[in-house]
Amino acid sequence: MAVQETDLDKQLLQLSIQVADLAARTDSRGSQKIQDFLIKTQQSLESPWETLMRYYDLDFQHVAIRIGCDMQVFTTLTTADKPMKLQDIANVNGASERLLGRVLRYLASINTIEEVGKDTFEANHITRTLSKPGIEGGIRLSSACQRPTNSALPDLLVERGFQDITSATETAFNKAWASREPFFTWVRSQPKIFEYLRLALDVQFREDWLNAFPLESHLGDFASRADPEKVLFVDVGGNLGIQCRGLKAKFPHLSGRIILEDLQETIDVALALEGVETLAQDYLTEQKVKGAKFYYYRNIFHDNPDDRCRLILDALKPAMEESSLLLIDDKVLLNQGSHRHVTMLDLAMMAQVASHERTRAQWQALLEGAGWKIEDIFQYSHEYDSIIVVKPAAQNA
């Protein structure tokens, strides 16, 4: 029997249409503001019991999504050309219909799939997102590695008398895994987790730094130099080369070599990119490419505590010429009111690698303490992703 539509249902539908229309007329920053407003409004309506249940649910959502990945729910529904019956999904993944039905009903209740009829389901936009290899890699990485680390963090902070974590071998990760190695050393001995990490890192951010950073205006006389060996761009620790590919696409007319650097095992699996050279390079060792115009480090510094960041900077400095620029692509936090996505990442980096997301003052202290100077900062996303333009301090004297 159909449920009769109430006046409240009609008003909520109109409100939903208004919100969707408002979101369609704004940019990503405005969209995030709308989402934050709706979340805050929802939380303001909660009873104490509903607040408790929300926190219970937050933890279990992650568990259920991981189960959905294991059961191939998201890829199965995404590739289907029509809604699927429970039995048909079970035929794909071999799950018992009773268990599968319980999982699917929960996934539908948290809007990761659509329940369109009795024991009938189809994909929505979140389903399609979760079916992407990089997104699934991030889910699996978080489930396999970050969740145990997060669980160990409260007890570790109690043991430390609530002092900041500053050693990469004394983190919540080390406590959870009973390891004395830094995370990025340990993870290379864990093939599955390392593959999840590689997939997650390959996910392109929604915003493109090249739209905000005026690269051509920072070239100086580089474009007019006739040297065929001159190097335009070195992507240090660049994983599979997404940024090199983006640079080539946006500035096909620029001359100069483009070089992708990472550890040998990453370079070995990177697909060949036309016009992009590859080079095995550990960013903690002296930079092999000398005199490039741009040395680009994306999310490298936020992976490392300050002492290791100083080693990274020291390894680069001998390669810099007077016209060279270091581009640090990382977050520059607000002193007040930073978004929860970024403050979450800050705690996650502390728990995993004893690092942190940095404010402008913290970036300045780190760089000036290592003999460098910030020339400019270009923010390119509403989550404070920024290009920090840096030169050795001696070049600014």
Curated annotation (Swiss-Prot):
Its EC number is 2.1.1.-. S-adenosyl-L-methionine binds at residue 262. Coiled coil: none annotated. Gene3D superfamilies: Vaccinia Virus protein VP39 (3.40.50.150), Winged helix-like DNA-binding domain superfamily/Winged helix DNA-binding domain (1.10.10.10). SUPFAM superfamilies: S-adenosyl-L-methionine-dependent methyltransferases (SSF53335), Winged helix' DNA-binding domain (SSF46785). GO terms for molecular function: O-methyltransferase activity; protein dimerization activity. The active site is at residue 302. GO terms for biological process: methylation; secondary metabolite biosynthetic process. Its cofactor is S-adenosyl-L-methionine. Keywords: Methyltransferase, S-adenosyl-L-methionine, Transferase. InterPro entries: COMT-like, O_MeTrfase_dom, Plant_O-MeTrfase_dimerisation, SAM-dependent_MTases_sf, WH-like_DNA-bd_sf, WH_DNA-bd_sf. Pathway: Mycotoxin biosynthesis. Belongs to the class I-like SAM-binding methyltransferase superfamily. Cation-independent O-methyltransferase family. 16-O-methyltransferase; part of the gene cluster that mediates the biosynthesis of the diterpene glucoside brassicicene C. In the first step of the brassicicene C biosynthesis, the bifunctional diterpene synthase bsc8 that possesses both prenyl transferase and terpene cyclase activity, converts isopentenyl diphosphate and dimethylallyl diphosphate into geranylgeranyl diphosphate (GGDP) that is further converted into fusicocca-2,10(14)-diene, the first precursor for brassicicene C. This is 16-O-methyltransferase bsc6.
